[in-house]
From Swiss-Prot:
Name the UniProt record assigns to this protein: Glutamyl-tRNA reductase
EC number, as in UniProt: 1.2.1.70
GO molecular function, one term: glutamyl-tRNA reductase activity
Annotated organism of origin: Xylella fastidiosa (strain M12)
Underlying gene: hemA
Pathway recorded for this protein: Porphyrin-containing compound metabolism; protoporphyrin-IX biosynthesis; 5-aminolevulinate from L-glutamyl-tRNA(Glu): step 1/2
Keyword presence, Membrane: no
Catalysis: reaction(s): (S)-4-amino-5-oxopentanoate + tRNA(Glu) + NADP(+) = L-glutamyl-tRNA(Glu) + NADPH + H(+)
Amino acid sequence: MTLWVLGLNHQTAPMELRERASFVGDALPRALDSLRNLPNVNEAALLSTCNRTELYAETTNAQMLLNWLEQHRPGLQNHLYQYSDAAAVRHLFRVATGLDSMVLGESQILGQVKDSWSMARTHGTLGNTLDRLFQHSFSVAKHARTNTRIGTNPVSIASTAVRLAQDAFSPLNESTVLLIGTGETIQLAAKHLSEGRVQRLLIANRTHAKAQMLASQHGGYALPLTELNLHLAEADIIFSATAAPTPIVTQSNVESALHIRKRKPMLLFDLAIPRDIETEVGTLTDAYLYTIDDLERAVEENRRSRREAAETAEAIIELQVKRYMDTLQAHAHQAPLRRLRTFGTTTRDELLTRARQQLANGRPAGEVLEQLAHGLTNRLLHPPTAALREAALANNTELVRAAEQLFPEKPGYHHPTLQTTIVKTDETDPAS
């Protein structure tokens, strides 16, 4: 059986294709049930997020997995990557650590990998191999994130702005934040702010229904954009990212708000292009304005820091891949060793029981011991001897060389001529 991963992600497929490839809601457990019924597939797990869909499986037939994927999500073949064994292990470790993410080092993916593992366990498609692999990936991700700065600095405009706001108004649970717009940047800011337990969140948008929807998701209050100036003075922090062609927050608006606030400072983040906030706002006393250019410099510094941390994380992963594969190989070798030991102990017990019975029947101890010794020798040595003879005839030097390593010839020692000794007994010894 070989470990395989088949998948696509943001690097190999556009958004519309990733959406079509995903397994969400009830589709995921149904897919796992289908995979469980495939012949020659021992184990399987599905990782499906907005940026990737990946199938992990232990199987002897990778083509069967490709056929299954084509049947359930047609049209993906030209966008798929596939890895096996050590490459598959390395890929999962990189995914769990955030090194394969659209945002380098993001931590959300680790939770999604854990969800994938949990779902596969629940539906009975996870066995020892994938269970051990996924759990090891969790440890690797934790180790990499603990020992590097791969996830410490924000690398999106929105998250960097929120981090600056937290530094300026700590804690946020004593601050009122006003969000203007409901696009992707504002949605991300709202997510980070709600995680920071902001005291009060106001959301203003031209389409009031969209503001209400975003507000309901994060415990905020929706405002029509026409009432924006009525609420400016309430805001300690403002994030704005709309598609307006001209500024919607003017110098005079902010000046009036500062007057009402009795000069209590305001922090403003203009995350829009073209600008939502007049540049003159930055000249006002007690108003601190950050634009995308200001934030981009901080973001690029953070990205550089993460790239440096990623190099260290990659080295950690390479070491962990080697350790994991060594462990896997050791486990693979344990099965024949267990069979060998079982064969030896079973043979010993069987012949020892017979010897005791013969002694109880009054047979001379010397004869019984001699038969026991010869029986053990013949029974234990017959399988390897026959295998070595066949290997020699087939020119299988690998097996012969292994035997030479196990039983090296000592200096001055000469092998006696191979003879078969038959000990006459009251009954025929099946081991002879």
